[in-house]
A protein has these predicted regions:
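Conserved donor NDP-sugar-binding/catalytic core segment of glycosyltransferases
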Residues: 85-114
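Active-site donor/metal-binding and catalytic loop motifs
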Residues: 179-210
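Catalytic donor-sugar/metal-binding loop of nucleotide-sugar-dependent glycosyltransferases
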Residues: 167-184
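A recurrent flexible, glycine/aromatic-enriched loop bordering the glycosyltransferase active site
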Residues: 123-143
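Short, well-formed alpha-helical segments that are part of the catalytic scaffolds
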Residues: 7-28
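Glycine-rich, basic loop-to-helix element that forms the pyrophosphate-binding segment
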Residues: 47-63
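Acidic donor-binding loop at a coil-to-helix junction in glycosyltransferase catalytic cores
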Residues: 158-165
Length: 223
């Protein structure tokens, strides 16, 4: 199986991407897990004109055209965990998309930590909706290439596009959130381009996206 790692490089992330790329190279050297070929596909958007969503979408199409079976979405300011590929050895046989526990490296810290309040399992889209989005899912994840191609990111959204995508994937496909991390989210490193947004903007948009999704899909929650 072939896996393509897709990384948009936004304004100010050029140096951070070098560290991101280094983490990918180390992980590949450590173990390719279930994959016979792993390629890293960065997208240069350092002018910030294209945006994360359009960058990811175009590169997914390129990856599929080159025979990718799986995609790993990794932001330029984040790091893949060295044994990430090993950790999904079994999961790729059973799921269409695979997330891990949220692990973060705070600005100025030396060591990453698992984010608190992740004890409640995520089993379905209802669980995603019920959970505070800060503690549920993040961008670094594996997804079957055909699933990613069929579910592009919404290019009209400058923030919250991640959660819009998560909801669609968890609603339609077999997904899992592992109890172990597969990437490290580096806090306080956000890009500052024309399509960037603050954490407050993100939460406000995500809450509206969740409300709209529940209404459109007529999802009834038990809690």
């Amino acid at each position: 199986m072939k896996c393509s790692i897709i990384t948009p490089i936004g304004p100010g992330h050029e140096q951070l991407f070098l560290q991101c790329r280094n983490s990918v190279n180390k992980a590949i050297t450590q173990s390719m897990g279930p994959f016979t070929e792993i390629t890293h596909r960065p997208i240069d958007d350092t002018q910030g004109l294209k945006g994360r969503s359009a960058s990811r979408n175009s590169e997914v199409a390129e990856a599929v055209a080159h025979g990718a079976d799986w995609i790993f979405f990794l932001d330029a300011d984040d790091l893949i965990i060295i044994d990430a590929f090993e950790k999904v050895m079994d999961a790729v046989k059973h799921y269409d998309a695979i997330w891990g526990a949220i692990c973060e490296l705070k600005k100025g810290a030396y060591y990453p930590q698992i984010r608190d309040e992740q004890d409640v399992p995520i089993r379905n889209v209802e669980d995603v909706i019920l959970m505070d989005p800060f503690f549920s899912l993040q961008m670094g994840h594996f997804v079957k290439a055909e699933v990613a191609l069929a579910n592009p990111f919404n290019v009209e959204l400058n923030t919250g596009e991640d959660f819009d995508y998560y909801l669609r994937i968890w609603h339609k496909y077999s997904c899992v959130k592992l109890k172990v991390p597969i990437f490290i989210n580096r806090r306080g490193m956000h890009s500052k381009g024309p399509k960037s947004a603050s954490g407050t903007d993100w939460r406000r948009n995500v809450e509206e996206i969740v409300r709209r999704f529940k209404r459109e899909k007529q999802i009834q929650l038990n809690k």
